[in-house]
Every structure is written in structure tokens, then in C-alpha cells.
């Protein structure tokens, strides 16, 4: 899924509207006044004068309205101010869900590479704890942590969110807050965890919206420094929360959702009852049922 953004005059947009009138579609975006879909490419014209083309090959349609392809950028977003967003904790039974959006400019690249910034999955926790504070101090970002207690209040059958829609909400809010703080990116990338269609479906339920298009890209943390920064800061935030929860219950809470998590969950049930899992774990995970089975 590619995205192209053009800044167009009122006259140019008027021409676009006439040319694409037969392809017009309805839009609920409060910042948009025209949308269309042509051969798999979605077009949205915003009141700001920006027009986005999004699809598998958006350059084909965009070239009809003044777009000229630029030399290919390097994967880390060379010459681009990039907002990258990533989450950590969604696959772990214990601990909260951390989402971070970060703004990285070309001027930051040398600093980030000097720290060895890379996909946090390739860094051990000790290294992450070491460099995350440096990133937090240097790089503009917004970090959100949904604690297990709050997670269990909003995620589950009959509740406001499922395990996917809650991530859409958090990514959207983190990016929204970063933009509100004055960040001016050339591109916004989220490490893909959902299809573009379903992301937009869940996004309709959110209160806060912004007109800048987002790109969902698989394994983005290994391609873009901004996403890697967010991944590292989010991992550190998740680890700090796991440490805090471990201290509160007197047990070392493991990361992940394997047999070790089942064992510790069973111990918590035995020591404190069901409420301990409500405040330390993502209760809807299968680990909860397995922990109860261990007590039989």
C-alpha cells in the first residue's frame, strides 16, 4: 500500500473533481470535501489543499495531476521527516500495552546510528533499558501505556474494544498528540498489525482524527529509524511496567504468553485470587483458563 500526497491549488483540485466525478465516493472525514476511488486507488481532497492518493500503485493516477516520481529514498527515510509508531506488549500475558509515536528527521540519523538503533526485537532488554532514556530525551515522541487494569476494563466480549481495535485507538491517539504538539512529518508509518481496510474501519469509531495519511507497513521497525525508535521506547515502557507490577505482587512476572506465564498466573490465583490477574495480566488470554486448570 503506497501513499502520495500532493499540495494542489483550488483550480487544480477543481479539475481533479471534474475528471473523477464519476468515481466519487462518500467520505465521513471532517477535513475532506471530496473522495473517489479509481482502479483500487483512493483519492481524498482536504480543505487544506492536500490531496492524497493511496493504493497499490498510486503514482499512476497521481501522475495525471502533476505528480513526478522522485529518486527512490533509502529505507530509513533519508531526506524525510518521518513519524513512526509501534506497540509492545500485545503478545504478552502479563504487563500493559505500550504504544509510542516518534518524529525522526534526517538530522537525527547520525545520532541514532551511533547508538546502534535498530529493530528492538534484535536488541536485548539490557541494551534497550540503556538507550531508551537517551532517545526519550532527544527525539520528539508521545508514549501511551494501557495498564492491565484499564486494558481489562475496555477489551473483551461486550466491551468497547477487541485486542485489535484497542491498538488502532492507541496508535491513532499517539500520532494525534504528536501532531498536536507541532510535529510536521513528510510521512507517517505504522508497523502493520492489521489491513488498511480494517484500520480505517476501526478508526471511524475514534473521536480524534487528523488529515495526514498513514502507511501501514510490515516489519517497518527494521526499515525506518522512526519506527525503531518507537519500538525501543515502547519496549522500555513495557518493561518498566512489568517491573512495577512484579514488585506489587511479589512475583517476577514473565514477558510472553508461554507455560511460564501459566505457572506464575496459577501462583497468583492461589495467593491473591482472581483480582490479581485482573490487575497484572490481559485477562482474555488463554493463559487465564490454563492457570485455573493448574489449580484443579
UniProtKB/Swiss-Prot annotation:
Main location: cytoplasm
Cited Gene3D superfamilies: Ribonuclease H-like superfamily/Ribonuclease H (3.30.420.10), TATA-Binding Protein (3.30.310.10)
Domain RNase H type-2 stretches: 80-296
Cofactor note: Manganese or magnesium. Binds 1 divalent metal ion per monomer in the absence of substrate. May bind a second metal ion after substrate binding.
Catalysed reactions, as listed in the record: Endonucleolytic cleavage to 5'-phosphomonoester
Molecular functions (GO terms): magnesium ion binding; RNA binding; RNA-DNA hybrid ribonuclease activity
Cited SUPFAM superfamilies: Ribonuclease H-like
Stretches assigned to coiled coil: none
Residues in the signal sequence: none
Subcellular location: Cytoplasm
UniProt similarity note: Belongs to the RNase HII family. RnhC subfamily.
PANTHER family on file: RIBONUCLEASE, RIBONUCLEASE H2 SUBUNIT A
UniProt name for this protein: Ribonuclease HIII
Annotated gene: rnhC
Amino acid at each position: 500500500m503506497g501513499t502520495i500526497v500532493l499540495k494542489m491549488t483550488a483550480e487544480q483540485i477543481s479539475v481533479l473533481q471534474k475528471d473523477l466525478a464519476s468515481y466519487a465516493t462518500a467520505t465521513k472525514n471532517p477535513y475532506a470535501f471530496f473522495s473517489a476511488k479509481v482502479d483500487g486507488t483512493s483519492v481524498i481532497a482536504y480543505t487544506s489543499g492536500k490531496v492524497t492518493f493511496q493504493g497499490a500503485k498510486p503514482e499512476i493516477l497521481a501522475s495525471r495531476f502533476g505528480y513526478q516520481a522522485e529518486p527512490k529514498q533509502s529505507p530509513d527515510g533519508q531526506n524525510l521527516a518521518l513519524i513512526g509508531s509501534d506497540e509492545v506488549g500485545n503478545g504478552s500475558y502479563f504487563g500493559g500495552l505500550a504504544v509510542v509515536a516518534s518524529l525522526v528527521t534526517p538530522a537525527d540519523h547520525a545520532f541514532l546510528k551511533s547508538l546502534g538503533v535498530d529493530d528492538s526485537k534484535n536488541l536485548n532488554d539490557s541494551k534497550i533499558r540503556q538507550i531508551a532514556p537517551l532517545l526519550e530525551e532527544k527525539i520528539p515522541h508521545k508514549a501511551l501505556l494501557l495498564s492491565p487494569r484499564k486494558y481489562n476494563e475496555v477489551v473483551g466480549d461486550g466491551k468497547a474494544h477487541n485486542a485489535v481495535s484497542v491498538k488502532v485507538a492507541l496508535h491513532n491517539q499517539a500520532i494525534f498528540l504528536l501532531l498536536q504538539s507541532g510535529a510536521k512529518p513528510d510521512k507517517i508509518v505504522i508497523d502493520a498489525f492489521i489491513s488498511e481496510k480494517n484500520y480505517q474501519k476501526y478508526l471511524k469509531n475514534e473521536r480524534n482524527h487528523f488529515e495526514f495519511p498513514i502507511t501501514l507497513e510490515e516489519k517497518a521497525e527494521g526499515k525506518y529509524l522512526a519506527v525503531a525508535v518507537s519500538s525501543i521506547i515502547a519496549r522500555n515502557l513495557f518493561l518498566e511496567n512489568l517491573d512495577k507490577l512484579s514488585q506489587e505482587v511479589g512475583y517476577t512476572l514473565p514477558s510472553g504468553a508461554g507455560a511460564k506465564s501459566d505457572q506464575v498466573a496459577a501462583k497468583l490465583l492461589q495467593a491473591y485470587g482472581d483480582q490479581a490477574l485482573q490487575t497484572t495480566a490481559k485477562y482474555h488470554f488463554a493463559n487465564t483458563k490454563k492457570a485455573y486448570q493448574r489449580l484443579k
